[in-house]
Amino acid sequence: MPEAATPHVGSIDVDIALDAVRLKAGRYAALLKVLLDTRRYRQGSKSFQFVTDVDLGDGEKSVQVEVEFLAPSDVKLTKNRPKLFAGFRVLRTEACGAVFRSPQELALTGKTIRGADNTVRLHVASVAEFLVMKAHAIGGRDKPKDSYDICYCLENYAVGIEPLAADWRGQRANKVYVKAVAILKEKFASPEAFGPQQVVEFHSASDAETRAMQARRAYEAAQRFLSLVG
């Protein structure tokens, strides 16, 4: 959200959602091989994860970036024989399928590993779909940044939360969205609930008044969204 008044804290991990429909006939294995052939990636601590070191050019130590591979839980990817990477397996998640509904194209300009200027175009999850993924995430793990990401999107989306809520309303028959709504209602039921308190934990403010304001703000942002979803 480059137009946001408050910048996002950023991220040092990349989630790649694998579309099984398009990755047939060995294309899934070919995708992994492209990364491995660069000799820049190695297996991470998780079975569905590669890691690579990125020099930000700021004079500091390189940052380790985690690249995680996800797929919808109800699809099957063609396995490569023999395996390209021992012990590697894609993480299947119920909400992953949502990201293929209406992805947005993002142009990314930078330098290749050989130093050439280049622009590539990526399909990324829309904000509405990103929120679905994050809602499911807070329903299954304790990672404060998930709740931060949800509230950041609700508070900073350029055209407001109404279009996001309208998108979710249009998916009322989709069980993945129904579950996402239920999770948000549970996790943001009050300022003292799991979601708002995760936001407080993420910001790590020292004084009680600031922490209370952060919790209240997170709660109200989620409640506004849920009231519009209906």
Give the location of each predicted region.
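Compositionally biased terminal segments of proteins
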Residues: M1-G230
